[in-house]
Amino acid sequence: MANNSKIIIAVIISGIIGFFFGKKSKDSNFSNFSDGGGVFPCPEPTKNLELNTRNRDKAIKADWIQYGALNLSDKAYYIRLAKHWNTSVAVAKKSTCGNCAAFDVSPRMKKCMSVGELQDKDGAFGYCWMHKFKCHSARTCYTWAKGGAITTDKVSYGWQERNQ
């Protein structure tokens, strides 16, 4: 084997080892989560209440996101949402985080979010890959996308890969 090939192989192996066992920078978006003998990263907001709250608050305030309704009986929110989507209030109310393509309730994400109660009378919490915070299935936002929720680890890892 040529010396260049050995160097390339060594760099690849070093990169793989560094990825799984290396030190993370202070601004890393992920923390480690052990799953069946392997190490997989959990999104940092699932483990960091301050970061999660900051991201959620930004999603509430951002004109282009408008995460809500904070009070599920807030009629004005759903009227605004329906107007934004050019649809009826009834249709807008059916487009929730719980059926959004970015709403992750996979088994591994439930383990990542294992702090506190994940379910209440209105629904359950999941992780929003679009806006990087734990969101509630009964709420919605302007960036809702058809096709969810994420219910398998494989799809969850795919979203994570695209978000790095």
What are these regions (language model features)?
Residues 2-26:
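Single-pass alpha-helical membrane anchors
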Residues 24-36:
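Membrane-engaging insertion elements
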Residues 33-164:
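Cysteine-centered metal-binding/redox modules
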